[in-house]
């Protein structure tokens, strides 16, 4: 198995995504590096759903997008994304196709993205973070991608990383 860290240069947008181009929303897209907690950047309000447990921070939906090159040579391999932590209710889309929905924000997870890839081309990875069920912790949990993301490629026949105990 070979892995590549892809924590750098993600496009970040806080707020609901609109299908139609909007010049004002385009201004709100900015580049971030991981780990990234967007909750700490949000407004403080006494009416925040988590109240004092979150320090009165509000959350909302956010999107992280990145184009990744997948070499043609990987076509006969399995390609995975491994996430060390996303808080929470994360949907991972590859080229517009939902690859996984991960509810728990504290558990690392991996997803096989091979079926969704265009080999020898750039591929769009979009991660939607929607920590809408509040309160979700007894302490400040943050919101966003708070750990690293690794791009893994390996032979199609392999032992799963969590397959031996």
Q: Regions from the language model: what does each represent?
A:
Residues 2-4, 11-17, 37, 54-162:
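Accessory beta-strand-rich segments of carbohydrate-active enzymes
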Residues 42-44, 57:
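Helix-terminus loop motifs that line ligand-binding clefts
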Residues 48-49, 162-165:
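Short, solvent-exposed loop/edge segments of extracellular or virion-exposed proteins
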Residues 10-41:
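Predominantly extracellular/luminal regions of secreted and cell-surface proteins
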């Amino acid at each position: 198995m070979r892995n590549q860290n892809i924590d750098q240069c993600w496009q970040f947008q806080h707020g609901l995504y609109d299908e139609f181009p909007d010049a004002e929303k385009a201004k709100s897209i900015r580049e971030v590096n991981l780990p990234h907690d967007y909750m700490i950047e949000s407004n403080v309000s006494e009416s925040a759903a988590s109240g004092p447990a979150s320090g009165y921070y509000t959350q909302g939906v956010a999107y992280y997008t990145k184009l990744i090159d997948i070499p043609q040579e990987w076509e006969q391999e399995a390609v995975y994304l491994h996430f060390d932590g996303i808080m929470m209710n994360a949907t991972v889309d590859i080229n517009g196709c939902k690859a996984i929905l991960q509810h728990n924000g504290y558990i690392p997870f991996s997803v096989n993205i091979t079926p969704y890839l265009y080999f020898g081309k750039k591929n769009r990875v979009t991660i939607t973070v929607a920590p809408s069920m509040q309160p979700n912790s007894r302490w400040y949990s943050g919101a966003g991608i708070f750990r690293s993301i690794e791009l893994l490629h390996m032979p199609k026949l392999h032992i799963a990383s969590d397959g031996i105990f």
